[in-house]
From Swiss-Prot:
Listed GO MF terms: cadherin binding; DNA-binding transcription factor activity, RNA polymerase II-specific; mRNA binding; RNA binding; sequence-specific single stranded DNA binding; single-stranded DNA binding
Protein name, UniProt field: Poly(rC)-binding protein 1
Species this protein is from: Homo sapiens (Human)
Single GO BP term: viral RNA genome replication
InterPro entries: KH_dom (IPR004087), KH_dom_type_1 (IPR004088), KH_dom_type_1_sf (IPR036612)
Phosphoserine, modified sites: S173, S189, S190, S246, S264, S273
CDD domains (alphabetical): KH-I_PCBP1_2_rpt1 (cd22515), KH-I_PCBP1_2_rpt2 (cd22518), KH-I_PCBP1_2_rpt3 (cd22521)
Annotated compartments: Nucleus; Cytoplasm
Residues that bear N-acetylmethionine: M1
Cross-link Glycyl lysine isopeptide (Lys-Gly) (interchain with G-Cter in SUMO2), sequence positions: K115
GO CC, alphabetical: cytoplasm; cytoplasmic ribonucleoprotein granule; cytosol; extracellular exosome; membrane; nuclear speck; nucleoplasm; nucleus
Purpose: Single-stranded nucleic acid binding protein that binds preferentially to oligo dC. Together with PCBP2, required for erythropoiesis, possibly by regulating mRNA splicing. (Microbial infection) In case of infection by poliovirus, plays a role in initiation of viral RNA replication in concert with the viral protein 3CD.
Amino acid sequence: MDAGVTESGLNVTLTIRLLMHGKEVGSIIGKKGESVKRIREESGARINISEGNCPERIITLTGPTNAIFKAFAMIIDKLEEDINSSMTNSTAASRPPVTLRLVVPATQCGSLIGKGGCKIKEIRESTGAQVQVAGDMLPNSTERAITIAGVPQSVTECVKQICLVMLETLSQSPQGRVMTIPYQPMPASSPVICAGGQDRCSDAAGYPHATHDLEGPPLDAYSIQGQHTISPLDLAKLNQVARQQSHFAMMHGGTGFAGIDSSSPEVKGYWASLDASTQTTHELTIPNNLIGCIIGRQGANINEIRQMSGAQIKIANPVEGSSGRQVTITGSAASISLAQYLINARLSSEKGMGCS
């Protein structure tokens, strides 16, 4: 890792989210919260942990990059201690690696993967860690999971490099501010129906709901601070709307946009409350070689974007000699903004995976 790049980012406030199983979180918290208190004090990072009635929980780390890296190193060391303890009386021939799951905005995954997978290959080779970026967004969010596995030093170094790529991506972003719909796990009692119709517990699904800080209120940002995210109040509104739906969350194609019926009065009322102005129209052009990524198989992707944003989206027929297709988005300013974000997230994701 380039030291100069690292030092230049030490004063940047960074927010990184981890997805962990309840048992792992319990170890990080420690008896009477002693372990997480020590990590907070020694690293200087702020640490939020989502409510405990879910099989999986979100740990949110916020602070200067050097504080984040210190907190990560301490968390990884704690996980390594747990592995060593579990191996004391074990007859297993090999010990499992330390494994972390980061939760990052889908718009940044393309940069992490790189053209033809070159960037993620570089990170793997330079750190020695195994790194896998999930192909699908986490349910009801615009985030994806990144799984990192290896020895503690490799995992720590890998996290640093991923953070640097995220910082670089933001600094080069022409838009500067993008909206992220954060993933939040659901309690185990709530079933979801996934792609293919399988029924399972929602340890990997969830509508947004409030998170609880062990020391204070929930954070307003779920990725790098400075990005525009849906506020906790709006998340609460979305949660209320989602719970009023009578159907289960049907995940079409596993993209994670489904779960809210945009035709319901509750959802229409929600978007109206965000922006009561008259409807407007926005047009954009998408290259012909990428339009299929937006439409999806049998229109699954575009329908999910319509449902999640509440906007009307029309894709013009191909025009001979044109290199792109015109897309017309109609709705309130809020719904148009969200539709644009979801389209950009899909494009960024597919470009990173080499969509042609």
